[in-house]
């Protein structure tokens, strides 16, 4: 299978940005970070996006996702966690090579923090709401992914596991 668009999917705080940058360096492909691209597309600062109502932010995230997908390959992109919620977006994800960066719920809560783009939800949600979101989205991420990586404590090791999967023929990453 040949792919030239790698989509990193998973919850907020999974490490899409960190792992995406490492993969970009390893593969010599551009990396499109959701937060950076969202800020550029909207013309809003990260701080302004971080204060935006969640529903409005999700609309912008969907527009950003579609805009990134329209770009020429090859590239790696970190996809906003909310994009998985709509079937039309899941269909687009399934059309590319998606890598699910999976981690346990406790790690999601710990990593997500309470500030930054998309973190509005964590400021107002209790653990049961975060658990509900995880329970709802986890199978959706898994169903859309062609490769799932159970994350370790090292982003470098996780990126190397992805590169190894690319190199052993699970997918072709030659651009």
Residue ranges and their predicted role:
Residues 8:
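Hydrophobic anchor at the beta1->P-loop junction of P-loop NTPases
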Residues 25-34:
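Post-Walker A helix-loop "phosphate-sensing" segment adjacent to the P-loop in P-loop NTPases
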Residues 80-84, 104-106, 154:
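Short glycine-rich anion-binding loops that position phosphate/pyrophosphate groups of nucleotides
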